[in-house]
């Protein structure tokens, strides 16, 4: 039986892009059902980050670029300022997942932002990314206008924050346990193998 692994991401988080190789290796070597879950790091009215301020260049120099070189995934600090909100991109993720294209769509969004320096808060950019993986422009436009999808996204955000307890991304949830940050493939596979065999209710009773 497949083990469900939920991965919580935000499309403006570079570490969520850099963990793709780890996820690919996990899928190759373990029987897992990967579910991408949204978690916006900065909800309205919290301002999003600006690349011209001190924080982003510093964290990229100290952490992002070294990790990029380590995992072999090219990546650049986007110049979009302020950084886009990701609500609309996540609304279209719902559509992509309905077509079993969630991972492909997410990769396209990451690529647009971190390699092509595009504004992934812009409808046209989201549509282009979605169409590139097989969705139609019409259905993506409908998804962007859908109040039902907007409500679902709010529910997804609440699930991540209130039910699971997510505070940072990427985070992985396996059998009610969280692995936070960017684990190595070895560590994540070990966690899946151990946690998938446990009974969460029994573990909680033993805590």
Identify what each model region corresponds to.
Residues 1-23:
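Local sequence-structure signature of Cys/Sec-based thiol-disulfide redox active-site neighborhoods
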Residues 15-28, 55, 108-207:
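C-terminal cap of thioredoxin/glutaredoxin-like
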Residues 17-114, 203:
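Structural alpha/beta surface segment adjacent to cysteine/selenocysteine redox centers
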């Amino acid at each position: 039986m497949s083990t469900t692994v939920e991965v919580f991401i935000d499309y403006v988080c570079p570490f969520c892009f850099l963990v793709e190789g780890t996820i690919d290796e996990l899928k190759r070597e373990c029987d897992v059902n990967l579910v991408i879950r949204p978690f916006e790091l900065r909800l309205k009215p919290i301002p999003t980050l600006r690349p011209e301020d001190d924080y982003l260049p510093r964290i990229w120099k100290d952490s992002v670029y070294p990790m990029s070189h380590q995992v072999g995934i090219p990546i650049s600090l986007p110049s979009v300022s302020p950084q886009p909100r990701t609500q609309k991109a996540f609304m279209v993720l719902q559509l992509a997942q309905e077509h079993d294209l969630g991972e492909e769509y997410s990769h396209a969004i990451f690529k647009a932002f971190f390699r092509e320096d595009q504004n992934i808060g812009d409808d046209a950019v989201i549509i282009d990314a979605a169409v590139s993986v097989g969705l139609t422009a019409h259905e993506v436009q409908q998804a962007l206008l859908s109040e039902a999808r907007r409500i679902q996204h709010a529910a997804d955000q609440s699930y991540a924050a209130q039910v699971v307890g997510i505070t940072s991304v990427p985070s992985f949830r396996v059998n009610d346990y969280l692995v936070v940050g960017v684990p190595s493939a070895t560590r994540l596979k070990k966690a899946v193998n151990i946690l998938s065999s446990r009974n969460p209710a029994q573990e909680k009773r033993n805590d």
